[in-house]
Each structure stands twice: as structure tokens, then as C-alpha cells.
């Protein structure tokens, strides 16, 4: 069922990876997007073998360059495929199956913690590695944290939940929402640059006003934009039927 939704360029790329001798998995948001019928802009690949050797193999096969960087302390190789405009991020996992499952356990949300094996010359989106029941949450339109530790590992995930909820029209699961509300101040330890990038992506959504309302519910809005929060309850008088805050949201809705 899911295999029929895959873009041809991505299918060719996955065939290339799965036909190699390396033990690899496709993981994260790209798995979610393909299941939902979207074409992902980025692919995340986990490799058990020599990450340098696999990255060289893939970059040469695609005639693309490699960028090496640290992502939350993990060595990551990024290959930019100029043909498909895809970013391919490659990360190594260790200690066999335990290391692989540990990687999935540190991902942000259950819908992003699914994986597909790219081994033995084949891949099958109907055979999903899903230890945290992400597919069930995907079918129920829910965003749920994998664990409390996974949220605190990178508090930007508080804001990312808002973007995903608004983008996919999903609800944030109640226990997850309560935990986010309690820990909303953790967003302040994230760099301004990363928050800025996430906010830009939120404002690019068609329903960014809904995202701001959700940010308020999660107590994130007053952490990032205290000036906006202060307009809540300020009457404008005259012919206005909304306070300054709701008027601003209505304006954003029509932009």
C-alpha cells in the first residue's frame, strides 16, 4: 500500500542504498511523510557499518559532495543530491539492534520514530519498524512524545510540535501537551538562531495564526514573544470587536 506512494527519484535512491553491502535504515520524518503520501525534502539514514565508507559510496554514486558536521554530539554526514534536491543525512548507530532501538528512542515524536530496513536489495514500507506505535498515532492524527527524556534532549521539540500540529492538522496528545506546558521555559535554553528558523517555518504555514494560539496554550508564546502575549485583553474601542491580541491573529490569518 505505502510503496505505491513513493516518488520515483526517492525510490531509485532507496534501491541504490538497499542494494549496497551496508546495513542501513531509513528513519524519522521522511518515513512519516512517505506514509502520508508526501514527498520528503530530506532523508535520514542510519548506518551500522563504517559511516565514512558508506558516505563515500553514496556521494560517488550520486556524484554529490559530502558535508560533515556534529548534530547534538553525533557525527553526521550530509549529502546534497543536486539531481533530486534532496538532503541525505547519514548517522551511525552502534551495538547492533540495541543501538538502533536506542536511536529511535531518542527521537522527538512517535510519528518520527519509525524506520524501514534498507537491506538485502529491497525495502518495504508495509514492513515498518515501529517500537513506539508511531503508525497508530499517525492514523489517529496524534503527536506524542517518545519519552520525557527525548523532549529534554532538545527543547526545540516543544516548538516543533506546534509546527507539526499545524502543518499536519494533528492534535498534541494530552499527556504530551501537559508535559510541554510544565516545561515551556526550557525553550529558553535553545539558541536564538534555531528558534528563529523554526518560527520562520511556522509563519510560512497557511494556518500560522492557529499555530500561535497553540503556542499560547503550551505557554511557549510568552517565552518567545512576551510582547504579543501582553496584548491579550487590551481593548481597542470603537468599532473593533476583538482585543489587540485576537485582532493580530485575525490579521495574520488573512495575510
For each feature predicted by the language model, list its residue ranges.
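Catalytic cores of the polymerase beta-like nucleotidyltransferase superfamily
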Residues: 1-255
Amino acid at each position: 500500500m505505502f510503496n505505491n506512494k513513493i516518488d520515483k527519484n526517492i525510490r531509485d535512491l532507496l534501491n541504490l542504498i538497499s542494494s549496497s553491502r551496508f546495513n542501513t535504515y531509513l528513519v524519522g520524518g521522511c518515513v512519516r511523510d512517505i506514509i502520508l503520501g508526501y514527498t520528503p525534502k530530506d532523508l535520514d539514514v542510519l548506518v551500522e557499518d563504517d559511516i565514512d565508507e558508506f558516505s563515500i559510496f553514496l556521494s560517488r554514486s550520486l556524484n554529490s559532495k559530502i558535508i560533515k558536521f556534529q548534530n547534538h554530539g553525533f557525527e553526521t554526514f550530509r549529502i546534497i543530491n543536486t539531481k533530486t534536491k534532496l538532503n541525505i543525512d547519514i548517522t551511525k548507530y552502534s551495538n547492533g539492534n540495541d543501538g538502533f532501538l536506542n536511536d529511535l528512542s531518542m527521537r522527538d515524536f512517535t510519528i518520527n520514530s519509525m524506520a524501514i530496513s534498507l537491506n538485502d536489495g529491497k525495502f518495504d514500507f508495509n514492513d515498518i519498524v515501529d517500537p513506539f506505535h508511531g503508525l497508530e498515532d499517525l492514523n489517529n492524527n496524534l503527536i506524542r512524545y517518545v519519552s520525557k527524556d527525548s523532549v529534554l534532549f532538545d527543547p526545540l521539540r516543544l516548538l516543533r510540535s506546534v509546527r507539526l500540529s499545524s502543518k499536519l492538522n494533528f492534535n498534541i496528545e494530552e499527556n504530551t501537551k501537559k508535559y510541554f506546558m510544565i516545561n515551556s521555559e526550557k525553550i529558553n535554553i535553545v539558541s536564538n538562531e534555531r528558534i528563529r528558523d523554526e518560527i520562520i517555518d511556522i509563519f510560512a504555514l497557511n494556518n500560522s495564526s492557529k499555530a500561535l494560539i497553540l503556542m499560547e496554550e503550551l505557554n511557549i508564546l510568552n517565552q518567545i514573544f512576551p510582547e504579543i502575549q501582553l496584548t491579550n485583553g487590551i481593548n481597542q474601542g470603537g468599532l473593533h470587536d476583538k482585543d489587540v491580541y485576537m485582532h493580530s491573529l485575525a490579521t495574520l490569518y488573512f495575510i
